[in-house]
UniProtKB/Swiss-Prot annotation:
Protein name: Adipokinetic prohormone type 1
GO annotation, cellular component aspect: extracellular region
Cellular compartment(s): Secreted
UniProt signal peptide: 1-22
Highest taxon above the source species: Eukaryota
Residues bearing the modification Pyrrolidone carboxylic acid: Q23
Function: This hormone, released from cells in the corpora cardiaca, causes release of diglycerides from the fat body and stimulation of muscles to use these diglycerides as an energy source during energy-demanding processes.
Keywords: Amidation, Cleavage on pair of basic residues, Disulfide bond, Flight, Hormone, Neuropeptide, Pyrrolidone carboxylic acid, Secreted, Signal
Length: 63
């Protein structure tokens, strides 16, 4: 019974190790990562401000 429990525990650990993955080596050449997201947000913020301005103009015309 003890051997069977040990085998089951070993099997569970082996399956968990096979399913898990991680990057073990780190390099400074990864770039800036998520900090570059601001460049992609600029067009969206421009469109948002443009739509807001047009909505204000349209709401002023309906009165």
């Amino acid at each position: 019974m003890v051997q069977r429990c040990a085998l089951v525990v070993l099997l569970v650990v082996a399956v968990a190790a096979a399913l898990c993955s991680a990057q073990l080596n780190f390099t400074p050449n990864w770039g800036t990562g998520k900090r570059d997201a601001a460049d992609f947000a600029d067009p969206y913020s421009f469109l948002y401000r443009l739509i807001q301005a047009e909505a204000r103009k349209m709401s002023g015309c309906s009165n």
